[in-house]
Amino acid sequence: MYRILVVDDEDAVRTAVRRRIEREGFEADEAENESQAEKKINSAEPPYDVVVTDMVMDSEASGATVLKAAVSRDIFTEVIVLTAYGNVANAVECMKLGAFDYVEKNIPGVDVYDLLVLKIEQAVQRRRSSIGTMRRADRILKSISEDDD
Amino acid sequence: MTKFACTCEGLAVFDRISSLLISADRDLDNIMDAILLTTMESMGAGRAFIAMVDYEHGELAVRYTSGSGWNEPNTRLRLKVSQESGRGITGHVAVTGKPHRTGNVHDDPYYISHFSDVVSEIAVPICDRHGRTQGVINVESSKPDAFGEEHEAFLCVIANLTALRLNEDLQAKRQAALVSFGREIGRFARTTALLQKVIRLVSEAISFQDCSIFLFNKDHTALVLEASLGELGKHIREAHYAPGEGITGWVAEQGRPVRTSDPRADPRWRGLHEELPPDKVGGLIAAPIVGYERVLGVLRVLRRRSEYAWVPNNFTEEDEEFVTAMASMLGAIIDSAELVKRLMEVERMAAWGEMSARSAHMIGNRVFAIKGDLNELRHVMAQGCARDAMNPLINSLERGVFRLEEILSEFREFVVATRLTTQPVSINELVSDAVREAFPRNTDVRLEMELAPDLPPVEADATKLRRCFSELVENSFNFQPNHGFVRVRTEPGPQPDRVRVLFEDHGPGIPEENKKSIFRPFFSTRSKGMGLGLSIVKGIVDAHNGTIRETGVHGEGARFEIVLPAAAETEQSQEN
């Protein structure tokens, strides 16, 4: 089962997101700020597959901090950034830092939860394929070194 | 040199008198009384007095007396002045500006009797630097031929020294007026009170019959009457000049003062809005009120034409310089007030920007959560679940909507926080009311109140300021551990026209890194509420032209310090 960490400083937001992704069969965990998120990311075993984090919590750079912590722990952990109104520029910054994607919390007429689930599924697939690729490469490298022997 | 002046005794008298004149004693009456007594005694005279010119009535009023025979009616004697003979030696001296000495008053054509025992009399004028008579020193003796040339010369020196001191006093008065007015810079007083203050200060330093202030309207197309003492006072905000129209309009357009003793003879004169009937005007100064970028208005001072030809009442160059200086300072004050207003506007706009961004963020988050609940509700309903499964979702939706409403209501409060309806109020009463309102009755938290007596009233919106204090009391109380304390104090501010209010507690205090943020909208370390409290408190204090700071030590308690300006003094409270 894929494990997802939901980071947001609003109880109601965490509850709603968690409920929705659990419905899809994912295992969800919560953190209410960046420092709690960093602790959980560093101690999780195995690492989280996907981290869904709010962009702005204690500071404007909260989302970026969580992102850095996640990829430092496991390069293949995918991070999806949630942005409230007016933070798209920051979200784009996160994309440059290696986030999988960003989801705007408020898009009129759109069920953003369905969109989020879709993004999580895509992120999970990419993680799976990244890990698969890495394992294959690993095997090839091993076989080459065995041939050399 | 004659015998009298050359003697050591004579020099000692000069020394005594000049010491009196240069003394730091500010009470002119004390000094004049002492000089008169010394002069009388040293001249061997029996009686002496000084009469000062009353410019308005063209009379001499006995002001200082010495020697025998003075009683209540005598000391209030007013001497009509005329150049005709038989109308009094004092009046004659005032008119001619020359000394007069007689060895036998009964042979003197000017003499009129106020005391039966007078035989010799000597009177010399006290003239200002423009040669205008300000008063007359009069010395009398019951002996014939009591005074010689040397006495006359001596008395002339005394009169000149007195004139110097009178002039110095006038200058000191003007300096004091300028200094006192200078203090207004940055005080941000209400304009009406400010203009009244200018008129009062000018009237203390220059005797005049009327004074008016015209200020340009917003689009700078007309000079509108904003303040006036006399008749013209009935036409405040009605009487106006176009730029360049009349002497007043010319002054505004050219940025230069005008001083004239006969406005009607001036080709620029139009006589549109006059404080006095045109034929009664004896002197006029119109000075431009100059701001940083342009002329803001005109300060106009008028004196009534004297009915007595000998009483000069045109304004002097010094008068013009003083009025011009006052007008310039008024310009600086109006400019500075405008600047502060603009700065506050900029700050307010910045606060607004932040408020809007943060509100949008918070509303966005709530709406996102509500949409999550709706999404789940739809799912639950599609699954055909029982009502019980829906209840938590409906509750959550209700909470979400409630929080949205909370944001809206705080937002509205932020908007109205700075719309004030002010009047002078007692700060102690406000603080007491707020404490009564916000501090719970049954609690083990101790309340300490220290209210300083005799604080000046503040110009405040009582309802808003009370709310602001209540918020701080409530804030302090909420952070108190058991048996903690909340201390509320009022005291004089850092300047005489400020008051300080302090709210201290023994709670956890504010961490250094949060001190800058606590007044920002939606900043809160409390789980309940949204943190708009302190930003509204700051908004209200700012709107009162006050300041608020948190000066507590983290770990020891919070300390909120508010400094508010006292209400501008009105003319009435000045008189009181």
Show which residues each predicted segment covers.
Chain A
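Short, conserved "switch-loop" micro-motifs in signal-transduction and mechanochemical regulators
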Residues: 73, 85-86, 97
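The short loop immediately C-terminal to the conserved phospho-acceptor aspartate in CheY-like receiver
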Residues: 56-58, 78
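Two-component/phosphorelay signaling modules centered on CheY-like receiver
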Residues: 11-30
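Acidic, metal-coordinating helix/loop segments flanking the phosphotransfer/catalytic sites
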Residues: 19, 30-50, 58
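Receiver (REC) domain switch/output surface
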Residues: 112-130, 137
